Amino acid sequence: MKNFNELSVTSSYKESNLQLVEQKACIVVGIANPRIKIRVEVLLSESPEYQTIYISSGSEIGKLIEEADLIIGSGITAYEGVARRKPVIVVGDYGLGGLVTPDTFRSQYNNRFKGRINGMKDESFSLESLEKEIKKAFSLTFQELQMMSNQIITYQNI
């Protein structure tokens, strides 16, 4: 997973020229609600440090999540992201649920990753608050992501 705060650069040798290629953080967005999706698109379109991919069909969820550095979405997209040890920001029909962390995992899971806990349908949220969550997402450790993934497996087997 790429660190948002660090510039990740790779080099390649091509025709006697050394080329530096900036690696952007890949954010996969899986939001069904069109109004909420537009709000997220507005923020991410203004952020050149991200490569953003929007899920358009259920059949591509797994492949895109594997390639992602961060998932923004709700429902099955968020669930799959956590299961595959990716940082997930829950944004759905019930607003901004925020970054899924070991402290918030159980309540988000019980809320089916639909948005803010006890949120209202079509609840609004500020783009600034989403931006803060994106920056926090890249500080989760592999151990934290693994722990939440293991919890999903445990809950499935109950």
Q: What are these model-predicted stretches?
A:
Residues 1-10:
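Short beta-strand->alpha-helix junction loop in the catalytic core
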Residues 27-37, 54-57:
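Glycosyltransferase donor-sugar binding loop
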Residues 41-56:
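Nucleotide-activated donor-binding/catalytic signature segment of Leloir-type glycosyltransferases, i.e.
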Residues 53-64, 76, 94:
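Conserved active-site histidine-acidic residue motif and adjacent donor-binding/catalytic loop
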Residues 68:
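An anion/phosphate-binding loop that grips the pyrophosphate of nucleotide cofactors and donors
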Residues 77-142:
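Catalytic binding pocket for nucleotide-activated donors in carbohydrate/polymer assembly enzymes
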Residues 136-157:
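A short, well-ordered alpha-helix in the C-terminal region of glycosyltransferases
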